[in-house]
Swiss-Prot record:
Family to which the UniProt record says this protein belongs: Belongs to the GreA/GreB family.
Species: Chlorobium phaeobacteroides (strain BS1)
Underlying gene: greA
InterPro entries: GreA/GreB_C_sf, TF_GreA/GreB_CS, Tscrpt_elong_fac_GreA, Tscrpt_elong_fac_GreA/B, Tscrpt_elong_fac_GreA/B_C, Tscrpt_elong_fac_GreA/B_fam, Tscrpt_elong_fac_GreA/B_N, Tscrpt_elong_fac_GreA/B_N_sf
Gene Ontology molecular function: any one: RNA polymerase binding
One Gene Ontology biological process: DNA-templated transcription elongation
Protein name, as recorded: Transcription elongation factor GreA
Coiled-coil residue windows: 43-76
Keywords from the UniProt entry: Coiled coil, DNA-binding, Transcription, Transcription regulation
Entry function: Necessary for efficient RNA polymerase transcription elongation past template-encoded arresting sites. The arresting sites in DNA have the property of trapping a certain fraction of elongating RNA polymerases that pass through, resulting in locked ternary complexes. Cleavage of the nascent transcript by cleavage factors such as GreA or GreB allows the resumption of elongation from the new 3'terminus. GreA releases sequences of 2 to 3 nucleotides.
Pfam families: GreA_GreB, GreA_GreB_N
Length: 160
């Protein structure tokens, strides 16, 4: 998998810190669980040992995934992001054209690894993100979501 992973500096640092914790603290805890389970004797019918080994497999997969993402990461500088169109790292103000009263919402488009809907950060790979990418102020967009179709007008594009 050679797809670039676009991250902010904070997003990169957060993933790097998570990897450090997994490789040191969590890996050590899992190895201790395996050693403890081994000490109980017969491994052929040792559910505790099997569970610890499964936890180790999952941990190593997560570590490998994070290492791969960090290797493929391109750190984006918000100061260099254009605001003529919607791109990754731009924020957009949208007017909901379906609402009875005026409803303005704001999203920031980020990578899947940094998405957090509670903070208004949506993935560029989400239905909303895909529909907004490349659009300009004044454009009207239709967005297919599981609940149906949404209609918005782009009011503003900016970088936070």
């Amino acid at each position: 998998m050679s797809d670039r992973v676009y991250l902010t500096k904070d997003g990169y640092n957060r993933l790097r810190d998570e990897l450090t914790v997994l490789k040191s603290d969590v890996r050590k805890e899992v190895l201790e669980k395996i050693a403890e389970a081994r000490a109980h004797g017969d491994l052929s019918e040792n559910a505790e040992y099997d569970a610890a080994r499964e936890q180790q497999r999952q941990l190593e997969n997560k570590i490998g995934d994070l290492e791969s993402k960090l290797t493929r990461a391109t750190i984006l500088d918000p100061k260099q992001v254009k605001t003529d169109r919607v791109y990754i790292l731009t924020s957009v103000k949208l007017k909901n054209l379906d609402a009875q009263k005026e409803e303005i919402i704001e999203y920031t488009l980020v990578s899947s690894d940094e998405a957090d809907t509670d903070l208004g950060k949506i993935s560029v790979r989400s239905p909303v993100g895909k529909s907004l990418l490349g659009k300009a102020v004044g454009d009207k967009v239709q967005i297919q979501v599981p609940k149906g179709e949404l209609h918005y007008e782009i009011l503003e594009i900016f970088v936070k």
